[in-house]
Amino acid sequence: MLAKRIIPCLDVTGGRVVKGVNFVELRDAGDPVEIAARYNAQGADELTFLDITATSDERDLILPIIEAVASQVFIPLTVGGGVRTVEDVRRLLNAGADKTSFNSAAIANPDVISQASAKYGAQCIVVAIDAKRRQGAEVAERGEGWDVYSHGGRKNTGLDAVQWAVEMARRGAGEILLTSMDRDGTKSGFDLQLTRAVSDAVGVPVIASGGVGNLDHLADGVQQGGADAVLAASIFHYGEFTVRQAKERMRERGIPVRL
């Protein structure tokens, strides 16, 4: 069994790391370069850097910050937010990213995933899916399940999250970064039903995201959700736990990790 990965996530806006609840109510968590260096030192397996307002602000990639982060980090770095084209992938890889994450652009133009994967390889193409459980009338109309949201969680695309994950993997995504919008920042644990549904449906690794409040939640994402990697922000940013503590807890629960 391959080692399961722990991935701290840096949500960045205005050049600062922030953290919110259900994608809003953002509070400052610090300087991205300093925080990235700290996680690198703590033994994180990878880092994910998301420019969370690039798409909604129609801004370009923040390459200088990405270069500064990459210079401090000697583990795989995934960068997302505002990634729109195959050319953007080239620019990010040149700036020091190891993987690039598409979200809204993949919804607008699914061919970009096929093209980027063909050019640079599936191993550096991640598709991020922000999913929200259907409620009320949506359930009556379309049945139980989850919809995909774009533009930083502001727009319901009407796409089914599980079907979309399958389509993205088919087109060449090497990994799915799956965030439960319902759980984001709530500290109540991953949406394990969502994680399991997507993990069971695709043949590529799934990174569970959204809702981690304690170390057991990380282990649950792997053991109950079927995730290959688990992503967290709040519990690490504000010093509640270190990556090392997270790995030790996962090992206690019988999950293979790199210590």
UniProtKB/Swiss-Prot annotation:
Its EC number is 4.3.2.10. It is found in: Cytoplasm. One of its GO terms (biological process) is L-histidine biosynthetic process. Pathway: Amino-acid biosynthesis; L-histidine biosynthesis; L-histidine from 5-phospho-alpha-D-ribose 1-diphosphate: step 5/9. Keywords: Amino-acid biosynthesis, Cytoplasm, Histidine biosynthesis, Lyase. Its main location: cytoplasm. InterPro entries: Aldolase_TIM, His_biosynth, HisF, IGPS_HisA/HisF, RibuloseP-bd_barrel. The active site is at D11, D130. It holds the Pfam family His_biosynth. One of its GO terms (cellular component) is cytoplasm. It catalyses: 5-[(5-phospho-1-deoxy-D-ribulos-1-ylimino)methylamino]-1-(5-phospho-beta-D-ribosyl)imidazole-4-carboxamide + L-glutamine = D-erythro-1-(imidazol-4-yl)glycerol 3-phosphate + 5-amino-1-(5-phospho-beta-D-ribosyl)imidazole-4-carboxamide + L-glutamate + H(+). GO terms for molecular function: imidazoleglycerol-phosphate synthase activity; lyase activity. Heterodimer of HisH and HisF. Belongs to the HisA/HisF family. IGPS catalyzes the conversion of PRFAR and glutamine to IGP, AICAR and glutamate. The HisF subunit catalyzes the cyclization activity that produces IGP and AICAR from PRFAR using the ammonia provided by the HisH subunit. This is Imidazole glycerol phosphate synthase subunit HisF. It comes from Acidovorax ebreus (strain TPSY) (Diaphorobacter sp. (strain TPSY)). The gene is hisF.
